[in-house]
Amino acid sequence: MRYITAGESHGPQLTVILEGVPAGLTLAAEHINKELLRRQKGHGRGRRMQIEMDTVEIVSGVRHGMTLGSPITLIVKNDDFKHWTKVMGAEPISEKESKEMKRTITKPRPGHADLNGAIKYGHRDIRNVLERSSARETTVRVAAGAVAKQILKELGVEIAGHVLEIGGVKAKHISNLSIEEIQIITENSPVRCLDKTVEQEMMDAIDNAKSSGDSIGGIVEVIAEGMPIGVGSYVHYDRKLDAKLAGAIMSINAFKGAEIGVGFEAARQPGSKVHDEILWDEEQGYTRKTNNAGGLEGGMTTGMPIVVRGVMKPIPTLYKPLASVDIDTKEAFQASIERSDSCAVPAAGVVAESVVAWELAHALVEQFGKDRMELIQQNITQHNKYAKEF
């Protein structure tokens, strides 16, 4: 499976085309809209989320609530486009009209794609960069992830995400929660945190950053249960599932690091405390005493829960802007301000769930049969029986 997204932040719409989704998957707009709404929530979101009420339109690949096996096209309209029709229109305009609009941006913002993108593509108006590099694009990545989650659900895999840290405020580790319990707790938390004792402290940190014109980042974790043993591969570097998951996390706007299992903590512990001892019993088959590997060894699943974390830097659009240089005059200046969040970590956790779900669904479809859901389900059932008796 693969997908491609298109659209600008203030353009008419965002589009994603999904290829390789098996036939026979139950899919309706309500499945996707539920995920889009989750992305819009979270303490610290900016005014854009009050403008947009994201809903999806399914325009191909689905008939009567069932996928056809052909490419699926999903569209999310930008309600704010009505205020940007001239600025973001596709038709040519004169230089005079361009100047009269006064929307040309020549001051790159530190931490954004602005300067590097302008140099790469030769844009003298940085708006041509920021419109596409905006995290608004993650709207349709979440839509794609919603389709992947539906695949996982029908294949017996559950997934959930939560926030571990915001602005240096850390949640306590809470274990032995089911995926359903994690989902219920986080959906009722303004910061998607499992630890209620630090919830208010996280919100205060966000509010303090906002009042001072600053922004803060954090850490999110995604957990998936029900993956069969041996999904992925050790044979080639580009087929290792952990590499794909890390790449997916790092592809999210403003994410600067990824961990699987105990992650970087493994460098501080001896091997005897890091590696997961193998157990076997008649009911479960092969299992592990611990899950420090985060459900992945040698690029393949171990049958234990998948545990992936991502680090999000503070959003670089600040209301107390940092120093920059005008690309036209070369004079020092304060970077331009676009409408932005003070903290998007809770929302980014939903995006992280989506990209992890896509990679897991892709791996299952690739390994167990690409054409139709019924065949994939049968093959996974046979594989699980084989692995248990191995």
UniProtKB/Swiss-Prot annotation:
- TM spans (from-to): none
Q: How is the cofactor bound?
A: Reduced FMN (FMNH(2)).
The family database entries (CDD domains) matched by this protein are listed as: Chorismate_synthase
Main enzyme class: lyase
Task: Give the EC number(s) under which this enzyme is classified.
Answer: 4.2.3.5
Q: Which Pfam families match?
A: Chorismate_synt
Positions bound to NADP(+): R39, R45
Q: Has keyword Transcription regulation?
A: no
Q: Lyase: is it a keyword of this entry?
A: yes
Subunit field text: Homotetramer.
| UniProt xrefs under NCBIfam families | aroC, PRK05382.1, PRK12463.1
This chain's protein is named: Chorismate synthase 1
